[in-house]
Regions:
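Short hydrophobic/aromatic patch on the recognition helix
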Residues: 45-55
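Residues in the helix-turn-helix
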Residues: 36, 50, 104
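Helical hydrophobic small-molecule/effector-binding pocket
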Residues: 84-130
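C-terminal peripheral helix-coil segments that are non-catalytic and often amphipathic
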Residues: 153, 157-177
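Basic, helix-initiating cap at the start of DNA-binding domains
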Residues: 1-26, 30, 39, 43
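Amphipathic alpha-helical packing segments from all-alpha helical-bundle domains
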Residues: 112-156, 176
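Alpha-helical residues within helix-turn-helix
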Residues: 36-39, 60
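Alpha-helical structural segments
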Residues: 14-25, 43, 60-80, 89, ...
Length: 177
């Protein structure tokens, strides 16, 4: 389920965002298992019931954060695609976005949440599955799922390795295997 969609009102959207930001800030300081819903509610001055009006659990809140970041990344790339960039510019823009999201990547690495990021990436890509089917020119959903899972795993692994290497320049040469 996508918890980043319209909650019905601006106040609800604002509260949802506040909960997400509180979790994100807490995770910058403490490990994921040690951050409780009670802690978040106390910091925000809300009841646990209020938290559960927006998210069924802490994982869903973190998923919403990741989903929002993925939507922002793709929105930025789509805006750039409208300007007919080169492949190198597209890749540079994509990597630049993830470099700016260093804190999120730190949280994922420190808390061993790679599978959560991969799941959100796959979910995000499936949102536009018909478009993906036309791009891949295949009607077989199993093939698409396999390709998506492989792509996401490769992409996430590459981004996290780059992050762990402190964003050292990536060098790709023709003929490299």
């Amino acid at each position: 389920m996508d918890y980043t969609k319209d909650s019905g009102s601006t106040t609800a959207q604002r509260r949802q965002r506040q909960i997400e930001e509180c979790l994100f800030t807490s995770l910058l300081q403490r490990p994921y298992p040690s951050v409780s819903i009670s802690d978040l509610c106390h910091q925000l001055g809300i009841s646990r019931k209020s938290f559960y009006n927006y998210f069924p659990d802490k994982d869903a809140c973190l998923q919403a954060i990741i989903s929002r970041k993925l939507h922002t990344c793709i929105r930025n790339l789509r805006a750039e695609l409208a300007e007919n960039p080169t492949e190198e510019q597209i890749i540079a823009s994509y990597l630049s976005y993830w470099k700016e999201e260093k804190n999120l990547l730190d949280i994922i690495v420190r808390n061993d949440l790679l599978s959560l990021l991969e799941d959100q990436c796959i979910r995000f890509l499936r949102e536009d599955e018909q478009h993906l089917l036309s791009i891949l020119d295949t009607p077989q959903l199993q093939t698409v799922n396999f390709v998506l899972a492989g792509f996401v795993s490769l992409q996430v692994t590459m981004i996290l390795q780059w992050h762990l290497q402190n964003y050292q320049p990536l060098i790709f040469r023709k003929g490299d295997n």
